[in-house]
């Protein structure tokens, strides 16, 4: 199991007041934003899924610049599958599904539809909103557990976007937590690696790994893509206030799509020395999930993670404008909101329309909220992802 907790940008008002006497500034040749350092705090701990608390060990750390979210985009397949459609192939009905999950529809890739194309469309829309040219992108992070190439899809996305400067592009595999990990990774690359414009994409097509005769899982998942542009900025404008990330491999048995047991050519190696060589082509099993255990895990760990991140940022639930969770189950979303005392009108949810879209769910919901005018520049959002691995994590961010 592992845990990580993150930088606190000086944009947090309470932290800025607490650290103001300690500010130090140094300058050299080059742009001022590259050489201005603010003294901020970070804290970390290593704990398990059943034991978390706010870290009280704080040590000063220098952060040269911040990062902010300046554009979003999303894309969905054209085929919509309703609960009534599913009732034609498994023993279920609309009321049974909607009461237990909050889901009524989901979108599914079919035929020659490509997840890479879907992700590229979402990324293109995010660039348009941010008014950033593709040639100015210097990193592409593709958060997915369902790449269309074993070795990853991110380079193909940068190609599809027409990025001519060969930006660093790679995949992040962390299931439904992937987008939150992607945001934190982008921030770390910007703060410590000199990157300026990072595309963070969450995209998954879990419908390809669903047993469509299993009503316990086929009702849950849909396909989609969402993206944001994370841009470097002065430390004072930093839009990632704090984060809190975890994993616990002991819970992997509750939610997995494991590789099938290798099949081998038993006719080889009559002397027994190479009996199981060469193996045949491997493939993955359908998604297997213990729904009750996943529900317990999410309701226990997600509020703890958000509370921890808020504490590191010097904030509490009343300071956030929006709660944006991975869209897995409406009961989970409501339970976490109740624990954090966040009213329903401050919850972002589009689960009913799209189902669980894994790494795409957070950026998809965020993009819709931004384009509808609900999320405005300056709004503070507590976001959290959780899923297979088990992995979970939260980030306190500011839009714009």
UniProtKB/Swiss-Prot annotation:
UniProt feature coiled coil, ranges: none
Cellular component terms per the entry's GO annotation: chloroplast
Key word Plastid present: yes
Main localisation: plastid
Pfam families hit by this protein: ACP_syn_III (PF08545), ACP_syn_III_C (PF08541)
Domain of life: Eukaryota
Catalytic activity, reaction form: malonyl-[ACP] + acetyl-CoA + H(+) = 3-oxobutanoyl-[ACP] + CO2 + CoA
EC number: 2.3.1.180
GO MF annotation: an example: beta-ketoacyl-acyl-carrier-protein synthase III activity
Location of the protein in the cell: Plastid, Chloroplast
Pathway(s) it belongs to: Lipid metabolism; fatty acid biosynthesis
Top-tier EC class: transferase
GO BP: any one term: fatty acid biosynthetic process
Keywords attached to this entry: Chloroplast, Fatty acid biosynthesis, Fatty acid metabolism, Lipid biosynthesis, Lipid metabolism, Plastid, Transferase, Transit peptide
Active site positions: 176, 326, 356
Listed HAMAP family: FabH
Role according to the record: Catalyzes the condensation reaction of fatty acid synthesis by the addition to an acyl acceptor of two carbons from malonyl-ACP. KAS III catalyzes the first condensation reaction which initiates fatty acid synthesis and may therefore play a role in governing the total rate of fatty acid production. Possesses both acetoacetyl-ACP synthase and acetyl transacylase activities.
Family to which the UniProt record says this protein belongs: Belongs to the thiolase-like superfamily. FabH family.
The name this protein goes by in its record: Beta-ketoacyl-[acyl-carrier-protein] synthase III A, chloroplastic
Species of provenance: Cuphea wrightii (Wright's waxweed)
Name of the gene: KAS3A
